[in-house]
């Protein structure tokens, strides 16, 4: 491809609304352009990268035995009402009506549509297991689209759905998808981690996320420094560092604590170690009209997913208002604790091992100091309620936990029978009896992968594409292309490289574009290999080569270039 026949739309300045580096570089390199909030047009350069991601995803899904389909982006409301998600999904679901006042939505995901397809096409156990996938545009009406492709409203996703008669069959396909995803992200050249995850609103049981490691990632991922244990922050099990509760050394006493509504104020005002304080948070209970107190140590954070999974707690999690708290307990936030607490209470494992701790007295502006379980109050229900912190013991007993930032690019779920039961999807078993099918769900954020790759691979000059993703493999940059000798040598080399199957961008812009600008553009775009053809080099029988990740260029004899490039690109 020649730049004279191509849309090369690089920008010198970074647009003001671009915050993260991937958004900045995608705009500056002329790969995408903003149409509206969270909506982007893919320009030719960016589309080449996107298609490469799609190709690798498609190849590995096909190799794993999945069957490609393409489902409508617009979905009838009746299907979502059948599954119960029409109301549950919330404002992110873009709803619309046609001219006949029939309700539809623009699909953020396709569980309902694929379940409807399956119940119309599958009728016998002999057709199972089966795994369908598509690569398609989705839409979620994010309240604050941000970070370019990282969190847009419209995005491209590969979603797959498998159907099974048994849990064992699902597990086999799930394991196959786990391996396929690992191959996909390895082929894409990304440093990634698969981690245990919570299924969230999509439902079901087992789940893994695939994260690209990057300091700019939105998610905390947790893994052991001595084993294969890995989970996201929502799922990671928090194991107390203490093996047993310490002995009581203080008497419990009631202390005036005026204007002490936060842990920081309690610690600073009374010279308490933060490890000797607790936080009491009040949420709605599973039983209508009830409240439940959740207690974590002062230096720990409540894990809302773990909290919502407690049988006593309403899901989704709803925090009680101050008015509700005062009506039920007689004191407000900042003065709450487990002593004489008139509502149900669950404490975190670390709290259960505390001694001589400080807690709100459920009396305004008062705390109890020197509180000890069993002596001063019975130990309530104990559960894992908190986020892990770096240095916690690994749940598998091997090593300690490390926390890094990650960008979620893939997620696989074991859905169970949630959708098949709701939408009456069943087939006849070998015994001739109807059986609800067990489902799996497997997603990859295809357009997000492009942004994640940049977040992980860039420098001060631009993008450092993994070789599998670069829009072009080779940039040919002639100096004074209008010179006959340079033009002939460049055109000959371009023909040889393209004939050999290499993807080449020939920068044949005229002399108004300086060599420095050409070099800067090729580095910004992230083309891995640059070859410079000059009159001086030709007179010496050499061409200048520079790898995008190299600090220095080198001269190569013209006759050796093809073998050199072939060897470089075969790695």
Swiss-Prot record:
GO MF annotation: an example: aminoacyl-tRNA deacylase activity
Primary site of residence: cytoplasm
One of the record's GO cellular component terms: cytosol
UniProt-listed CDD domains: ProRS-INS, ProRS_anticodon_short, ProRS_core_prok
Catalytic activity: tRNA(Pro) + L-proline + ATP = L-prolyl-tRNA(Pro) + AMP + diphosphate
Membrane spanning stretches: none
Keyword Transcription appears in the UniProt entry: no
Class of this enzyme: ligase
EC number in record: 6.1.1.15
GO biological process: prolyl-tRNA aminoacylation
Gene3D superfamilies tied to this protein: Anticodon-binding domain (3.40.50.800), Bira Bifunctional Protein, Domain 2 (3.30.930.10), YbaK/aminoacyl-tRNA synthetase-associated domain (3.90.960.10)
Keyword list, A-Z: Aminoacyl-tRNA synthetase, ATP-binding, Cytoplasm, Ligase, Nucleotide-binding, Protein biosynthesis
Cited InterPro entries: aa-tRNA-synt_IIb, aa-tRNA-synth_II, aa-tRNA-synth_II/BPL/LPL, Anticodon-bd, Anticodon-bd_dom_sf, Pro-tRNA-ligase_IIa, Pro-tRNA-synth_IIa_bac-type, Pro-tRNA-Synthase_IIa_type1
Annotated compartments: Cytoplasm
PANTHER family hit by this protein: MITOCHONDRIAL RIBOSOME PROTEIN L39/PROLYL-TRNA LIGASE FAMILY MEMBER, PROLINE--TRNA LIGASE
Comment on protein domains: Consists of three domains: the N-terminal catalytic domain, the editing domain and the C-terminal anticodon-binding domain.
Subunit structure: Homodimer.
Name of the protein this chain belongs to: Proline--tRNA ligase
Gene: proS
